[in-house]
């Protein structure tokens, strides 16, 4: 009878005790599940912090150069400059004059060389060299040709030189002897009277007058002849 009034109190204690035990078990089970689960997602971004209070660090090394840029378009032309003063042409004109003079000398030497090449091999006698190109021409042209070649018309001053001229000419040729200044008085074209002669018999005879020049025949003898006639040119040079 005494226990009956206490029955509700006992039921409450058992109920609380049983509920507390279940809660602990649930708590253990819950903690076990959390420990075994994966990481959760990141939370929302926090607010920007305040600037730091430390010293500023050193500047870093420069970076690599970038690629060159594209070539720009040409700029607009600048203004035209003022007209300059006339140059001094005197020095240029002097140089041109000198060059022209040198060219004339070279041409003259070339012409001389070409004419010398036209002559056959000569014949040396003592200190003289006699040469011919075997061309026939009047005495005036023979004299001009030999002078242009810096020689003279062949003059035999002894029998040896006369023989050399005869062999070189291989035909009739003019000698550097005339009586143009005084008839009958034959002189060398270089000046002076004859010191040697080899006239053909009855020569010189001034046949028909006007035979003021001298030729050497095939046999080496001399004959007076008109200076307008044409015979071979033989020139002499110092050897």
Swiss-Prot record:
InterPro entries linked to this entry: C-type_lectin-like (IPR001304), C-type_lectin-like/link_sf (IPR016186), C-type_lectin_CS (IPR018378), Ca-dependent_lectin (IPR051077), Collagen (IPR008160), Collectin_CTLD (IPR033990), CTDL_fold (IPR016187)
Annotated stretches, region: Disordered: 35-88
Tissue: Detected in liver and blood serum (at protein level). Detected in liver.
GO molecular function, one term: D-mannose binding
Residue numbers carrying 4-hydroxyproline: 44, 51, 62, 68, 74, 79
Keyword Metal-binding included in the entry's annotation: yes
Subcellular location as annotated: Secreted
Binding site for Ca(2+) 1: 179, 183, 211-212
Post-translational modification: Hydroxylated on lysine and proline residues within the collagen-like domain. O-glycosylated. O-linked glycans on hydroxylysine residues consist of Glc-Gal disaccharides bound to the oxygen atom of post-translationally added hydroxyl groups.
Residue span(s) of domain C-type lectin: 144-239
Intrachain S-S bonds: 146-235, 213-227
SMART domains: CLECT
Pfam families assigned to the protein according to its UniProt record, in alphabetical order: Collagen, Lectin_C
Domain Collagen-like: 37-89
Binding site for Ca(2+) 2: 203, 205, 211, 223-224
Database matches in Gene3D superfamilies: Mannose-Binding Protein A, subunit A
Main location: secreted
UniProt feature, compositional bias: Basic and acidic residues: 38-50
Compositionally biased intervals (Low complexity): 58-74
PANTHER family per record: MANNOSE-BINDING PROTEIN A, PULMONARY SURFACTANT-ASSOCIATED PROTEIN A
Function: Calcium-dependent lectin. Plays a role in the innate immune response by binding mannose, fucose and N-acetylglucosamine moieties on different microorganisms and mediating activation of the lectin complement pathway. Binds to late apoptotic cells, as well as to apoptotic blebs and to necrotic cells, but not to early apoptotic cells, facilitating their uptake by macrophages.
Protein name: Mannose-binding protein A
Gene name per UniProt: Mbl1
């Amino acid at each position: 009878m005494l226990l009956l009034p206490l029955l509700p109190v006992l039921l409450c204690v058992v109920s609380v005790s049983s509920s507390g035990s279940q809660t602990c078990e649930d708590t253990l089970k819950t903690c076990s599940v959390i420990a075994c689960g994966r990481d959760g997602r990141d939370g929302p971004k926090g607010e920007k912090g305040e600037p730091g209070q430390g010293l500023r660090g050193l500047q870093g090394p420069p970076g690599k150069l970038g690629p060159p840029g594209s070539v720009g378009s040409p700029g607009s032309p600048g203004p035209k400059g003022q007209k300059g003063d006339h140059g001094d042409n005197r020095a240029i004109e002097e140089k041109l004059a000198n060059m022209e003079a040198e060219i004339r000398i070279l041409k003259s030497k070339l012409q001389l060389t070409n004419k010398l090449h036209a002559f056959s091999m000569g014949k040396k006698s003592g200190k003289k060299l006699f040469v011919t190109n075997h061309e026939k021409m009047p005495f005036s042209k023979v004299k001009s040709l030999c002078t242009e070649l810096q020689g003279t018309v062949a003059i035999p001053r002894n029998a040896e030189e006369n023989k050399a001229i005869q062999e070189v000419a291989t035909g009739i040729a003019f000698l550097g002897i005339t009586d143009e200044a005084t008839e009958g008085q034959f002189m060398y074209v270089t000046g002076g009277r004859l010191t040697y002669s080899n006239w053909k018999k009855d020569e010189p005879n001034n046949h028909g007058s006007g035979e003021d020049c001298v030729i050497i025949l095939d046999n080496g003898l001399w004959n007076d002849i008109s200076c307008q006639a044409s015979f071979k040119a033989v020139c002499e040079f110092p050897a």
